[in-house]
Structure formats: C-alpha cells, structure tokens
Amino acid sequence: MSAKDILFDASARAKLKVGVDKLADAVKVTLGPAGRNVLIDKKFGAPTSTKDGVTVAKEIELEDSFENMGAQMVREVSSKTSDVAGDGTTTATVLAQAIYREGLKNVAAGARPIDLKRGIDKAVKEVIGELRTISNDISGKIEIAQVGTISANNDPEIGQLIADAMEKVGKDGVITVEEAKGMDTELKVVEGMQFDRGYLSPYFVTNSEKMDAELEDPYILIHDKKISNMKDLLPILEKTAQSGRPLMIISEDIEGEALATLVVNKLRGTLKVCAVKAPGFGDRRKAMLEDIAILTGGTVISEEKGYKLENATISYLGQAATVTVDKDNTTIVEGKGQADDIKARINEIKNQIDASTSDYDTEKLQERLAKLSGGVAVINIGASTEVEMKEKKARVEDALHATRAAVQEGIVAGGGVALIRAAKGLDNVQPENEDQKTGVEIVRRALEEPLRQIVANTGTTDGAVVVERVKQGEGDFGFNARTEEYEKMTEAGVVDPTKVTRTALENAASVAGILLTTEAAITDIKEEGGDMPAMPPGGMGGMGGMGGMM
C-alpha cells in the first residue's frame, strides 16, 4: 500500500474549500441568460464551447489532491442533479458553494459542525415543502415551450420544437435528439408502434417506389416460435384468405417451405401478406410481443400458454388501421386493442421503471412505454460546424430533461425567485439549539445566492440591491436578467421545473453538510519524478571497443 498524506480539522477544510471554490467559480459563470461560455481544451479535435454546468464540472481535475477532493465532492452535486432532474446543475453548484462557505465561517467561530448540519437538513426539508406549495402544474403547450426555452439558454426555437414533440407523442412518448446531416434543425415524428425489424423477403413489397409493404386494416398473427412447416400455418391462412383482409405475421422467424409458400401466395394475389421477425431477444422479446398483442387486441400464440399455431382462429389475431413495413422497420398505426388493457399495460411498465435499478433496463422500458403511448419523436440538430452542433445538442438534451421534470412536478417562478419565496418555510423550523438555528440561517442566506449570481453575470447591476428589491416583492415578482427589468416572472415566461429546483437544493445541502462535518482528509502521497530509477545510457553496453573494427 502506498504512503498516505493526512490533513486535519481547519487545515483539511481550508484545502477542500479551495477545491470547491475553483470548480464552483468555473461553473457559475454559465448561470442565467447572461451566463458566459466556458471553453474546454480536448486532447483530440477542436476545443468544446459549453454553457452547461455539468459539462464544465466533469472536466475539472486539480493537481493538488486535497483540493481535488473538494472539487470532486461538488462535481458529485452537479452530476447527481443532472442524473435525477436533467438540469439545474449550475444552481446546485452555486448553492453547495454558498452553504459550505457560510458553514465554514461558523465552524471557525466555534459552532458544532454536526448541529450546523442538522439545522441545514431541517431547513432544506421545510424549504422543499414550501416549493411544493407554490408549484403550479404544467399543462399547456405554451408553458412547456417556456420551460424548454429557458433551459436551452433562452433559445425559443428549441423550446418550440420540444413543445411540438411533446404535443405529438405525449408526455410519456420517447423524444430522441440526433445530429442532422444538414444545417436545419427539425422535428420528425413516427406515429404508432415502431420496431426495428424489416420484411423477410422483398417480394412482400406492395409499393415499389417506396420499397415498402403497406397493409390496410390487416389481421396480425403474433407467434413466439420459428415457423418452418407450412401445415402449421395453413389453417389460419385459409381463414384469413376467406375474410379478404391482409395478414401481417410477426414470429421468431419464418423459413423454408413456410416462407416460400407465403411469397408464392403473395405473388399470385391469393393473399396479401407480409412477415417479419419478432423484435428484441429473450425475455425482452416475449414482453414486446405481449405489448404488440395488447395494442392490437390479439393473443400471443405461445405453447407456454397452451396455444398451438395449427389450432389458431381469427379471434387470436390482432388488428390495426395500417401496418407499414420497409427493409429495416415495422410500424403499426392505430392498434385496435382495448383502451383499458393498454392503460393497464402502460401502468405495469411504469411500475417496472420505478423499480428498475439498471439504466439500460430503464431506457428499454421507457422505449416500450412510448411505443404503447403513441409514438417516437426525433429532433434532428443542424449546425454550421461540429463544435456548434455539439453545443446545441447538449442544450436541446438539457431542455428536454427540464420539460420532462416540469411535467412530473410542475413549475415555479424562475430566475432564483422561487428559492427566495420558499425561504418563508424556514419560519416553521424548530431548532433545538443555537448552532442548529445558525444552520437554518446559513440556508436562508444560500437561497439568495442563485439570484445574486444571475445578476452578477449580467455585469451591470448590484446583486445585493436586486435581492433586497425581490425580497420586498410577492409571488412571482422578480428580476428578469435577460431584459434587466423587474416583472412577474411567470408572465414573462421565466419559469423553472419544481423538480429541478428541489433536486438542486437537496443535493447541494447533502454534499455541503458532508464537507462541513469532515475532520480529516486522506490522500496518496504523490511520488516525485526524481525517485524514478535512472535510464541506462544509450547504445549497447560493453561494445564500445568495437569502434576499432572499422
């Protein structure tokens, strides 16, 4: 084990504070509509320009190990807030720095760190309760656009795109952000359920221009096993042909005699048919087939459930308004399943998402949820240069996370106003001693810091004056840093998701409390470069005398 370096009490906290301040000072310049960009050097390629707090925080590594520990603790505030709420990372960093700074002053003056932390925790609990009280539910497209605009650093185009996407695919729909090949940023929506499986044979194509198979009002056969024997499939084919409607087959695979017979019947015009492989693998495939069955009102023909393909009847088949299949994807529009069954399935998947501990599983469950809920929207980001594209894509992703958070828990007045109004909740705190009371006052002072920093970034107004003026106001009265005017923030479209504000405060207080109660810091002693063994001299030792051979 390598030797360790240890610092205690005030010495440890002072070093940690230097690290906290270095990271926070780099991050907080990005806060608010007047926030500045940070340029980050990359070992490969062009530097990255960003106004995203968590991106800045993740790039910071300090040379001094003790300072770096402080910086990494605050980086944790930023990344945790980003993971949970998707935005608010800079606000969280500013709050953490303010709570730690004020707390350190009091620890140096003789306050007990543990009681300070307890006071801070009690205060945060009451402030969050007050935030929930003043929060308003979000419903309209305009409000969603406002949240997206603010989170995208006041870019109304991005706010409107996200509002359009949410309107088309619903609040549970999947919205993905991709890089466009051109310079235009645009929204593309795929309605219905789409999965990444194309036709098994190009002979199934009905539209030779688009090279896709379009089935109107088809029956849908869903089978979880491979189909290779024609006699198993024949009974249901005959019943479908008699009805005169097209047939869509989704199964593990179709091969040999069965596939050849389907192609021949399609070419002869006996039966309008198309076949695709089932999406996914293993247990996820079973779940997705069940989703398709519920969406279309059909039954998965599975021997595990006691159903056999040769005994299948029309009642086993699902139905939809249209099914479109190209070489890569299958899209089912307006499945004719029972609304109550679909709703129950959606709730079941939501419960699985809540219980999931894996990011990958959660992502796949959310995709399934979206496909049942109404569709997938893709925002294609266009820009002139790669640097601009990456910066814009990061802003769109932030804005998307923020709007989802707003839909979940509502919105509060933005621009740091909500935190100042929520300070009213501190009157309900019952501290057990003077040090806990001091902890409450630390939070009261810290709640003003985001507004103070937003104003500082404008570079034109005194933050202390603005904070006092806002504190004298009521409701959503605040300072709009973009126009540099005092006005009602909600009417001006300056709003924040409640979840973002809440998460930022919770995480900031948690990490600041840990830092305040730290009494020792331990790190590896860095080995000096001079301790490395000397390299042997150049050439091949012992062969110097060979020079006389020339």
UniProtKB/Swiss-Prot annotation:
Source organism per UniProt: Chlorobium phaeobacteroides (strain BS1)
Catalytic reaction equation(s): ATP + H2O + a folded polypeptide = ADP + phosphate + an unfolded polypeptide
Protein name: Chaperonin GroEL
Family assignment from sequence similarity: Belongs to the chaperonin (HSP60) family.
Gene assigned in the entry: groEL
Phylogenetic classification of the source organism: Bacteria, Pseudomonadati, Chlorobiota, Chlorobiia, Chlorobiales
GO MF entries: ATP binding; ATP-dependent protein folding chaperone; isomerase activity; unfolded protein binding
Cross-referenced SUPFAM superfamilies: GroEL apical domain-like, GroEL equatorial domain-like, GroEL-intermediate domain like
Biological function: Together with its co-chaperonin GroES, plays an essential role in assisting protein folding. The GroEL-GroES system forms a nano-cage that allows encapsulation of the non-native substrate proteins and provides a physical environment optimized to promote and accelerate protein folding.
Biological processes annotated in GO: protein refolding
Pfam families the UniProt entry points to: Cpn60_TCP1
GO cellular component: cytoplasm
